[in-house]
A protein has these predicted regions:
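N-proximal helix/coil linker or "cap" segments that precede and/or mark the start of modular domains
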Residues: 5, 15-32, 49-50
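Structural microenvironment flanking redox-active thiols in thiol-disulfide oxidoreductases
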Residues: 67-108, 118-125
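A short beta-strand-turn-helix
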Residues: 33-54
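Sec-dependent signal peptide recognition
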Residues: 2-8
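Short pre-active-site segment immediately N-terminal to redox-active cysteine/selenocysteine motifs
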Residues: 52-54, 58-62, 130
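Thiol/disulfide oxidoreductase modules built on the thioredoxin-like
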Residues: 103-110, 118-163
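Short, acidic, Ser/Thr-enriched surface-loop or helix-capping motifs
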Residues: 24, 37-38, 137-138
């Protein structure tokens, strides 16, 4: 009987313990950061936001939904890059798997910037507790959208927002 009671207690409590909601960062100023890109050069967020919207995509090579989402973001990037849209794909791969990032990006032919956040310092600034995690920043450096996870069709919301921001 004690085991059954304990099991029921654990099953009732476990979902609330496991549920980690990302803090709502929409409407806040985007924290600045400086990360290394795949060419070994530093990229600073504040130097990217003045031209138009910036999409931050937190991802990893081992995350299948992340890879699916990045393919969709690449399509959006191709459509709007000449109008000032920037994508910063922030790899959260740890030191042991970061060597897979550059070959993967090259194999897909992605042209947007890929940054390395191996210690998750920037991910923590944006409360990206899980991936994929997407943040859209306007040209004034304000966060206008954030989203955890990926399901086919999520990219349509991002594209709509990017299009609207570029029309202003």
């Amino acid at each position: 009987m004690k085991i059954i009671c304990l099991l029921i207690f654990v099953l009732l409590i476990l979902p609330s313990v496991l549920a980690q909601e990302n803090e709502d960062i929409t409407g806040k100023k985007a924290p600045n950061f400086k990360l290394i890109n795949l060419d070994g050069k530093y990229v600073e967020l504040n130097k990217e936001t003045g031209n138009g919207p910036v999409l931050l995509s937190f991802w990893a090579t081992w995350c299948k939904p992340c890879l699916e989402e990045m393919a969709e973001f690449n399509k959006i990037y191709k459509e709007y890059k000449d109008k000032g849209f920037t994508v910063l794909a922030i790899s959260t791969d740890a030191e042991k798997s970061v060597a897979k990032v550059k070959p993967y990006i090259k194999s897909k032919g992605y042209r947007f910037m890929v940054l390395l956040d191996t210690n998750n310092e920037v991910a923590r600034k944006y409360y990206a507790q899980q991936i994929p995690f997407t943040v859209l920043i306007d040209k004034n450096g304000n966060i206008v959208y954030s989203h955890l996870g990926y399901m086919k069709g999520d990219e349509q919301k991002v594209e709509k927002l990017v299009s609207e921001m570029l029309e202003k």
